[in-house]
């Protein structure tokens, strides 16, 4: 999530999703993101890395309010995220993979944490779970100091 450097905006949260050939996962991800945005002003930005399937047509049919960037080549994950960041208007920006379901309370929990720790907080990570509800260790990495 980005915070202090964002320009003033009426949008609370921008969600950036990079897509590559995961049409049905993408649909589920966007549905869960919309549910998580309840109570916030938000926008969802999908950057498609030239999927070559009908991901974007399907997305536009199901979610006409989602902002779409269509790349003519696979720009890679990092560059595609940067394209989404460049147009994001939210006070905070969330990177969300297209095969992720975000809990309906997750954004609220993150914002509550930020509100309590804003002076000491530069970013927020969440606990990730697999499809069976088991903790994914890659959601917590420690660096020795």
Regions picked out by a protein language model, each given a short descriptive name:
Residues 104-138:
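Conserved donor NDP-sugar-binding/catalytic core segment of glycosyltransferases
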Residues 93:
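Short aromatic/hydrophobic "clamp" motif used to bind/position activated sugar donors
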Residues 1-35:
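N-proximal low-complexity "stem/linker" segments adjacent to membrane-targeting elements
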Residues 29, 55-56, 81, 105-107:
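Acidic donor-diphosphate engagement hotspot in glycosyltransferases and nucleotidyltransferases
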Residues 32, 48-57, 73:
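A conserved acidic beta->alpha catalytic loop
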Residues 70-88, 109:
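Glycine-rich, basic loop-to-helix element that forms the pyrophosphate-binding segment
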Residues 41-50, 69-71:
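Short beta-strand/loop segment that forms part of the nucleotide-sugar
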Residues 97-101:
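The conserved acidic donor/metal-binding loop of glycosyltransferases
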């Amino acid at each position: 999530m980005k915070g202090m450097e964002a320009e003033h905006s009426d949008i609370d949260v921008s969600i950036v999703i990079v897509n590559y050939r995961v049409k049905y996962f993408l649909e589920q991800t966007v549905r869960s993101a919309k549910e998580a945005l309840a109570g916030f002003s938000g926008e969802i930005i999908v950057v498609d890395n030239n999927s070559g399937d009908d991901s974007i047509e399907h997305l536009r049919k199901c979610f006409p309010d989602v902002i779409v960037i269509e790349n003519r080549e696979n720009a890679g994950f990092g560059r595609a995220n940067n394209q989404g960041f460049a147009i994001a208007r939210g006070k905070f920006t969330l990177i969300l993979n297209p095969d992720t379901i975000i809990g309906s309370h997750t954004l609220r929990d993150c914002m509550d944490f930020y509100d309590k720790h804003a002076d000491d907080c530069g970013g927020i990570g969440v606990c990730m779970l697999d499809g069976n509800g088991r903790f994914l260790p890659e959601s917590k990495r420690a660096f020795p100091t």
